[in-house]
Amino acid sequence: MFLSDEIPILANLPVDREYADIYFLHDIHFGSELFDEKKWETLKSAILSDENSYICIVGDVFENAIPNSKSDMFSQTHSPAEQKDWAIQQLKDLSHKILEVVSGNHESNRTTKVCGLFPLYDCCLIAGIGEKYRETIAFIDIAVGRYRGNSHKQMHYFGQIQHKAKDLRSYHSSDYTDGIDFFASGHDHEAKDKPRAKLVFDKHNKVIYKRNVECINCGSFCKFGGYGSKNAYRPQSDKMYRLRLYGNEKRMETTGFYL
Protein backbone atom coordinates (compact mmCIF):
# COMPACT_ATOMS: atom_id res chain seq x y z
CA MET A 1 0.00 0.00 0.00
CA PHE A 2 1.07 3.62 -0.43
CA LEU A 3 2.99 5.47 2.27
CA SER A 4 1.24 7.64 4.85
CA ASP A 5 0.85 11.35 4.18
CA GLU A 6 2.74 11.95 7.42
CA ILE A 7 5.92 10.47 5.96
CA PRO A 8 7.75 13.32 4.20
CA ILE A 9 9.31 12.88 0.78
CA LEU A 10 13.05 13.59 0.75
CA ALA A 11 14.20 14.84 -2.65
CA ASN A 12 17.97 15.27 -2.77
CA LEU A 13 18.83 16.91 -6.09
CA PRO A 14 22.37 16.99 -7.54
CA VAL A 15 24.81 19.23 -5.68
CA ASP A 16 26.05 20.75 -8.94
CA ARG A 17 22.68 22.43 -9.59
CA GLU A 18 22.76 26.17 -8.98
CA TYR A 19 18.98 26.11 -8.84
CA ALA A 20 15.98 23.87 -9.45
CA ASP A 21 12.83 24.88 -11.33
CA ILE A 22 9.75 23.17 -9.91
CA TYR A 23 6.63 22.80 -12.08
CA PHE A 24 3.37 21.92 -10.35
CA LEU A 25 1.30 19.93 -12.85
CA HIS A 26 -2.33 19.21 -12.09
CA ASP A 27 -5.84 19.22 -13.52
CA ILE A 28 -4.53 17.64 -16.69
CA HIS A 29 -7.80 15.76 -17.25
CA PHE A 30 -6.62 13.45 -20.00
CA GLY A 31 -9.70 11.78 -21.46
CA SER A 32 -11.80 14.92 -21.27
CA GLU A 33 -12.89 16.43 -24.55
CA LEU A 34 -11.38 19.68 -23.24
CA PHE A 35 -7.88 18.27 -22.65
CA ASP A 36 -5.30 20.57 -24.27
CA GLU A 37 -2.83 18.09 -25.72
CA LYS A 38 -0.66 20.77 -27.33
CA LYS A 39 -0.17 22.58 -24.02
CA TRP A 40 0.73 19.33 -22.28
CA GLU A 41 3.20 18.15 -24.91
CA THR A 42 4.84 21.58 -25.15
CA LEU A 43 5.51 21.78 -21.43
CA LYS A 44 6.51 18.13 -21.16
CA SER A 45 9.10 18.59 -23.91
CA ALA A 46 10.48 21.75 -22.28
CA ILE A 47 10.86 20.01 -18.91
CA LEU A 48 12.57 16.96 -20.40
CA SER A 49 15.09 19.15 -22.23
CA ASP A 50 16.13 21.13 -19.13
CA GLU A 51 18.32 19.42 -16.52
CA ASN A 52 17.23 21.92 -13.86
CA SER A 53 13.50 21.24 -14.26
CA TYR A 54 11.51 18.99 -11.93
CA ILE A 55 7.84 18.11 -11.45
CA CYS A 56 5.36 17.86 -8.62
CA ILE A 57 2.04 16.29 -9.65
CA VAL A 58 -0.97 17.66 -7.78
CA GLY A 59 -3.90 15.46 -8.85
CA ASP A 60 -6.57 15.08 -11.53
CA VAL A 61 -4.20 13.53 -14.04
CA PHE A 62 -7.10 11.96 -15.92
CA GLU A 63 -10.82 12.69 -16.32
CA ASN A 64 -12.05 9.32 -15.02
CA ALA A 65 -15.76 9.92 -15.65
CA ILE A 66 -17.70 6.98 -14.21
CA PRO A 67 -21.42 6.42 -13.40
CA ASN A 68 -22.81 9.02 -10.96
CA SER A 69 -19.83 11.36 -11.32
CA LYS A 70 -20.31 14.98 -12.40
CA SER A 71 -18.37 14.49 -15.65
CA ASP A 72 -20.06 13.30 -18.82
CA MET A 73 -19.03 9.70 -19.50
CA PHE A 74 -20.21 9.85 -23.08
CA SER A 75 -18.06 12.80 -24.12
CA GLN A 76 -14.82 11.20 -22.90
CA THR A 77 -12.29 10.67 -25.65
CA HIS A 78 -10.85 7.58 -23.95
CA SER A 79 -12.16 5.01 -21.51
CA PRO A 80 -10.94 5.13 -17.88
CA ALA A 81 -8.72 2.10 -18.59
CA GLU A 82 -7.15 3.85 -21.59
CA GLN A 83 -6.68 6.96 -19.48
CA LYS A 84 -4.68 4.93 -16.97
CA ASP A 85 -2.51 3.54 -19.76
CA TRP A 86 -1.77 7.09 -20.92
CA ALA A 87 -0.95 8.23 -17.39
CA ILE A 88 1.41 5.30 -16.89
CA GLN A 89 3.32 6.21 -20.04
CA GLN A 90 3.58 9.88 -19.04
CA LEU A 91 4.83 8.95 -15.56
CA LYS A 92 7.41 6.60 -17.07
CA ASP A 93 8.61 9.28 -19.49
CA LEU A 94 8.95 11.81 -16.66
CA SER A 95 9.92 9.46 -13.82
CA HIS A 96 13.41 10.96 -13.39
CA LYS A 97 11.85 14.43 -13.13
CA ILE A 98 8.97 13.65 -10.77
CA LEU A 99 9.52 14.47 -7.10
CA GLU A 100 6.04 13.59 -5.78
CA VAL A 101 2.48 12.68 -6.77
CA VAL A 102 -0.81 13.30 -4.96
CA SER A 103 -4.27 12.29 -6.11
CA GLY A 104 -7.13 14.64 -6.96
CA ASN A 105 -10.90 14.45 -6.68
CA HIS A 106 -11.21 12.88 -10.14
CA GLU A 107 -9.31 9.92 -8.74
CA SER A 108 -10.19 9.71 -5.04
CA ASN A 109 -13.80 10.94 -5.19
CA ARG A 110 -14.65 8.54 -7.99
CA THR A 111 -12.91 5.19 -8.35
CA THR A 112 -11.65 5.21 -4.75
CA LYS A 113 -15.00 6.21 -3.28
CA VAL A 114 -17.00 3.73 -5.37
CA CYS A 115 -14.83 0.63 -5.18
CA GLY A 116 -11.83 1.32 -2.94
CA LEU A 117 -9.23 1.38 -5.69
CA PHE A 118 -6.53 4.00 -6.16
CA PRO A 119 -6.00 4.46 -9.91
CA LEU A 120 -3.23 7.07 -9.76
CA TYR A 121 -1.31 4.98 -7.22
CA ASP A 122 -1.61 2.00 -9.57
CA CYS A 123 -0.10 4.14 -12.33
CA CYS A 124 2.77 5.22 -10.08
CA LEU A 125 3.52 1.62 -9.09
CA ILE A 126 3.69 0.47 -12.70
CA ALA A 127 5.84 3.48 -13.61
CA GLY A 128 8.25 2.61 -10.79
CA ILE A 129 7.61 5.67 -8.60
CA GLY A 130 5.18 4.26 -6.03
CA GLU A 131 7.26 5.62 -3.13
CA LYS A 132 6.64 9.17 -4.37
CA TYR A 133 2.84 8.86 -4.11
CA ARG A 134 0.77 10.30 -1.28
CA GLU A 135 -3.01 10.04 -1.20
CA THR A 136 -4.03 13.48 0.11
CA ILE A 137 -1.11 15.68 1.19
CA ALA A 138 2.57 15.44 0.33
CA PHE A 139 5.16 17.05 2.57
CA ILE A 140 8.42 17.35 0.66
CA ASP A 141 11.95 18.40 1.58
CA ILE A 142 13.87 19.47 -1.53
CA ALA A 143 17.66 19.74 -1.21
CA VAL A 144 19.46 21.57 -4.01
CA GLY A 145 22.95 22.88 -4.76
CA ARG A 146 25.71 23.68 -2.31
CA TYR A 147 25.06 26.12 0.50
CA ARG A 148 27.60 28.94 0.00
CA GLY A 149 29.92 26.56 -1.78
CA ASN A 150 29.97 24.04 1.07
CA SER A 151 29.99 20.64 -0.65
CA HIS A 152 28.71 18.90 2.48
CA LYS A 153 25.61 21.02 2.97
CA GLN A 154 22.73 21.58 0.57
CA MET A 155 20.05 24.25 0.69
CA HIS A 156 16.72 22.78 1.85
CA TYR A 157 13.18 23.90 1.03
CA PHE A 158 10.15 22.37 2.70
CA GLY A 159 6.80 22.30 0.91
CA GLN A 160 3.20 21.17 1.32
CA ILE A 161 1.31 19.91 -1.72
CA GLN A 162 -2.38 18.97 -1.90
CA HIS A 163 -5.07 19.02 -4.56
CA LYS A 164 -7.69 21.09 -2.70
CA ALA A 165 -7.00 24.11 -0.51
CA LYS A 166 -8.87 26.74 1.48
CA ASP A 167 -8.01 30.24 0.30
CA LEU A 168 -9.77 32.89 2.36
CA ARG A 169 -8.84 36.46 3.16
CA SER A 170 -7.61 35.70 6.67
CA TYR A 171 -6.89 31.98 6.34
CA HIS A 172 -5.15 29.65 3.90
CA SER A 173 -4.48 25.91 4.03
CA SER A 174 -0.78 26.69 4.20
CA ASP A 175 -1.37 28.15 7.67
CA TYR A 176 -1.78 24.81 9.40
CA THR A 177 1.76 23.57 8.79
CA ASP A 178 4.66 25.34 10.47
CA GLY A 179 7.99 25.62 8.71
CA ILE A 180 6.94 25.33 5.06
CA ASP A 181 8.53 27.50 2.38
CA PHE A 182 6.02 26.81 -0.37
CA PHE A 183 2.50 25.45 -0.85
CA ALA A 184 0.96 24.16 -4.08
CA SER A 185 -2.63 23.23 -4.87
CA GLY A 186 -5.04 22.92 -7.78
CA HIS A 187 -8.65 21.79 -8.27
CA ASP A 188 -10.33 25.11 -9.15
CA HIS A 189 -8.37 25.61 -12.41
CA GLU A 190 -7.63 29.18 -11.30
CA ALA A 191 -3.99 30.03 -11.99
CA LYS A 192 -2.55 32.23 -9.28
CA ASP A 193 0.63 33.17 -7.47
CA LYS A 194 -0.61 34.35 -4.10
CA PRO A 195 2.18 34.47 -1.50
CA ARG A 196 1.26 34.48 2.17
CA ALA A 197 3.20 35.39 5.31
CA LYS A 198 3.05 34.64 9.01
CA LEU A 199 4.76 35.94 12.12
CA VAL A 200 7.07 33.49 13.88
CA PHE A 201 8.58 33.69 17.34
CA ASP A 202 12.24 32.68 17.47
CA LYS A 203 12.46 31.26 20.99
CA HIS A 204 16.25 31.02 20.87
CA ASN A 205 16.96 34.62 19.89
CA LYS A 206 13.77 36.02 21.50
CA VAL A 207 12.67 37.89 18.39
CA ILE A 208 9.65 37.84 16.10
CA TYR A 209 10.24 37.63 12.36
CA LYS A 210 8.10 37.31 9.26
CA ARG A 211 8.15 34.08 7.27
CA ASN A 212 7.08 34.18 3.63
CA VAL A 213 5.35 31.23 1.97
CA GLU A 214 4.98 30.91 -1.80
CA CYS A 215 1.42 29.70 -2.59
CA ILE A 216 0.94 28.58 -6.17
CA ASN A 217 -1.88 27.21 -8.32
CA CYS A 218 -0.94 26.41 -11.92
CA GLY A 219 -4.41 26.38 -13.46
CA SER A 220 -5.16 23.43 -15.71
CA PHE A 221 -4.57 21.76 -19.05
CA CYS A 222 -8.18 22.25 -20.15
CA LYS A 223 -9.74 24.40 -22.82
CA PHE A 224 -12.88 26.36 -22.00
CA GLY A 225 -16.27 24.70 -22.44
CA GLY A 226 -18.17 21.68 -21.20
CA TYR A 227 -18.97 21.55 -17.48
CA GLY A 228 -17.55 25.02 -16.85
CA SER A 229 -19.53 26.87 -19.49
CA LYS A 230 -22.73 24.93 -18.73
CA ASN A 231 -22.51 26.06 -15.11
CA ALA A 232 -21.79 29.69 -16.05
CA TYR A 233 -18.18 29.61 -14.83
CA ARG A 234 -15.91 32.23 -16.32
CA PRO A 235 -12.96 31.23 -18.53
CA GLN A 236 -9.73 30.72 -16.60
CA SER A 237 -6.32 32.10 -17.49
CA ASP A 238 -3.86 29.85 -19.35
CA LYS A 239 -0.98 31.21 -17.28
CA MET A 240 1.33 28.79 -15.50
CA TYR A 241 4.07 29.21 -12.91
CA ARG A 242 7.47 27.78 -12.09
CA LEU A 243 9.06 27.97 -8.67
CA ARG A 244 12.83 28.45 -8.71
CA LEU A 245 14.75 27.25 -5.66
CA TYR A 246 18.33 28.48 -5.39
CA GLY A 247 21.12 26.26 -4.12
CA ASN A 248 23.72 28.72 -2.87
CA GLU A 249 21.38 30.79 -0.69
CA LYS A 250 17.84 30.55 0.70
CA ARG A 251 15.94 32.29 -2.08
CA MET A 252 12.81 31.51 -4.09
CA GLU A 253 11.34 33.05 -7.23
CA THR A 254 7.92 32.38 -8.73
CA THR A 255 7.71 33.21 -12.43
CA GLY A 256 4.58 33.21 -14.57
CA PHE A 257 4.56 32.19 -18.22
CA TYR A 258 2.31 31.22 -21.10
CA LEU A 259 2.78 28.33 -23.51
Outline where the language-model segments fall.
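Glycine- and charge-rich intrinsically disordered segments
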Residues: 1-16, 150-151, 255
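Conserved beta-sheet core of the metallophosphoesterase superfamily
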Residues: 158-252
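Charge-rich, low-complexity terminal tails
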Residues: 103-115, 238-259
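Core catalytic region of metal-dependent phosphoesterases/phosphodiesterases
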Residues: 8-132
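Alpha-helix termini
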Residues: 47-48, 128, 144-151, 199-208
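Active-site neighborhood of phospho(di)ester-bond hydrolases with catalytic His/Asp-centered motifs
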Residues: 24-27, 54-60, 98-105, 133, ...
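Beta-strand-turn-beta hairpins that frame and shape the catalytic cleft
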Residues: 12-23, 139-159, 210-213
